[in-house]
Amino acid sequence: MPAGERLPGAPAREERIVVHVDMDCFYASCERRREPALRGAPVVVGMGYEPDQTVGAVATASYEAREYGVESAQAISAALERLPRKADAPDASAAGYYRPVDMAYYESVSESVSEILHGLGDPVREVSIDEAYLDVTDRTAWDVAAGFGRHIKQRIARSVGVPASVGIAPDMSTAKLASDHEKPDGLVVVPPESVQSFLAPLDVADLHGVGPVHARALRERGIETVGELADADPYVLEAAFGERGREFHRRARGADSRPVEPRGKPKSLSRESSFDGATESFDRVREQAAALSGAVADRASRTNASYRTIGVKVVTPPYDVQTRAESLPGPVDDPALLEAVSQSLLDEFEGAAVRKVGVRVSNLVFSEREQATLAGFSGDETGDGGGHEGGACGGAGRGSCGGQTTLDEFT
């Protein structure tokens, strides 16, 4: 939808529609995406469970694993006491599948989710690898917000293969509470007229920003629920907790006025696209990469960004992520060069089956002035001052991928 164009019936700007997307047990969901046989089984992602390891912790536990008392940040030894490894007890009915943390892979999946979200919301605020806010005020209306939320969930599930919980509300704090309300794979819509009734019965500790220490202090003052916090005297709260007390009161009333804003300037710009299954037609791969290069170049131009590095990402079956990049003598804004370098970087993958291809620029420089092209620098058109850098993340390289992309790249 063009900037500034509103959907017929969309609310006025002051009636915001904010979406919070939270990927359920994200690391475990990624492992199930890679190993579909793990669906429905207890999955624990962490380090320290191998026989030669003595120290480690749980990064993520699936909901099935949580039923056995396994929790995030728990010592791996405690997790193993509650839920032994299937590899150690193959015949046990109560055993789980333990997998090592593979950040490169999780970041790749997160990038795919990010690509979808940036196409559905404007603006988008990514707060972590598995969580984001979208302002969709101009994209939908309250009477069809539930359908819009289902569309987000379905796009992520079908295109990426991981589940998400979605909360929709007039403000960021309430939207986050809504996404937590029916996990996993939930969808909760809280329209403006329902905010107070939704918030009031919730435990005060559930309110966004209220940690265990403040929750205990509030309970000592007789405040147990969000509704009681909303009814409290804001001056008394401010006297007890400072400005944070005022903020607690605003959020308890559904009056969180924070705008959905991106976190600073991006470190990279990228676009990527998946094929139906895996394609062995490299002409299709090159054609898609050319289109992606054009989209990235357009985004760089619109944001007054020049770039020192051009890279590509290729995902081959089953879900092996490989990246290649070339550094340039200096920052440029040159669409023709971007396409030429990205096509050159793809050469080594000719003949491979490809599930997904992506193009990115990084090492960005932002300026209001006219950007340079490579002709403004000494050296030849291949960027001789740089060279290739990259890495592959396959089965043997899980958890340690030299040159692998990071979350700030390819987003």
From Swiss-Prot:
Residues 253-274 have a biased composition (Basic and acidic residues). This is DNA polymerase IV. Poorly processive, error-prone DNA polymerase involved in untargeted mutagenesis. Copies undamaged DNA at stalled replication forks, which arise in vivo from mismatched or misaligned primer ends. These misaligned primers can be extended by PolIV. Exhibits no 3'-5' exonuclease (proofreading) activity. May be involved in translesional synthesis. It is found in: Cytoplasm. Binds 2 magnesium ions per subunit. Monomer. The active site is at E131. One of its GO terms (biological process) is DNA-templated DNA replication.
